[in-house]
Amino acid sequence: MESGDLKIFQAVARKGSISKAAESLHYVQSNVTNRIQQLERQLQTQLFYRTNRGMTLTPAGENLLKDADRILQLLHEAQKTAQEAGDPNGPLRIGSLETAAAVHLPQFFTEYCSRYPKVQLSLSTGDTHTLVQHILHYELDGAFVYGPVEYEDLEQVAVFQEELVLASNKREGSLQDLLREPILYFAAGCSHRRKIKNILKEEAVPAHKIIEFGTLEAIIGAVQAGMGVSFLPASAVRYFQNRKNLFLHELPEQFRDMNISFIYQSDLFLTSAFEELLNGLKALPNGR
């Protein structure tokens, strides 16, 4: 069994189909099919149930996926260990909430990359649930999420304190009236949905139309145009507030607080690049 076989198996398990895995790996589909079949013959067990809807893991496949995740992470860490010489260097895979990536992180990472030019930084965005799953599967080294998160295997550093507000194109209006407009969410999943449901319940506003968008810019533009209202961090609204028709409205005190934490696996091999990242985060004015 080679590491390449495990990467292919991991991709098929995550994507749920041969074609999607082949596309993500830039392989031809027949090659992926053959490698999975060879792996099953080698292990003398079925790893996937094959249906018209795609591929799902058998119990044996689920066990192998856990081992494959760890083995591939160990290989990744071995590569980083071999590169650990001199100044911080090598790959650093970071995930972030889109609002944090737009508002809090540009200056921080500009200074970090200037100080450590040999580090190969990659920054991807997503919602808290997706980013946590990427961390648990060793697909990211660390991520900025709404915290705290309840996973024993994760280390967490509180880095930013935020205030949740309601963004609208109306300067004035009661919270109850504003909440009767359509609510604009991130399409990938909104980390505040439970809190928003509680706000609607508190204000006696029935659930109504939801419109989903893919980016923060799109949500801000839609709010300005009067398409609806959106629950966003105050810093994100202020970041765009030089634009016309964009106003923030305070929420009841019990719904305002938001904490952004930086999370990573407890057993992650801490390269000098990662340690310097942690040191920088802990030194931030809002850090702890």
UniProtKB/Swiss-Prot annotation:
InterPro entries xref list: LysR_subst-bd, Tscrpt_reg_HTH_LysR, WH-like_DNA-bd_sf, WH_DNA-bd_sf
Residue ranges of every copy of the HTH lysR-type domain listed in the record: 1-58
One term of GO molecular function: DNA-binding transcription factor activity
Keyword Cell division: yes
Coiled coil (residue ranges): none
Residue ranges flagged as DNA-binding region: 18-37
Keywords for this protein: Cell cycle, Cell division, Cytoplasm, DNA-binding, Septation, Transcription, Transcription regulation
GO terms of biological process kind: division septum assembly
ATP-binding among keywords: no
Primary location class: cytoplasm
GO terms for cellular component: cytoplasm
Subcellular location field: Cytoplasm
Entries under Gene3D superfamilies matching the protein: 3.40.190.290, Winged helix-like DNA-binding domain superfamily/Winged helix DNA-binding domain (1.10.10.10)
Entry similarity comment: Belongs to the LysR transcriptional regulatory family.
Summary of the function given for this chain in its UniProt record: Regulates expression of the cell division protein ftsW, and is essential for cell viability during stationary phase.
Protein's recorded name: HTH-type transcriptional regulator YofA
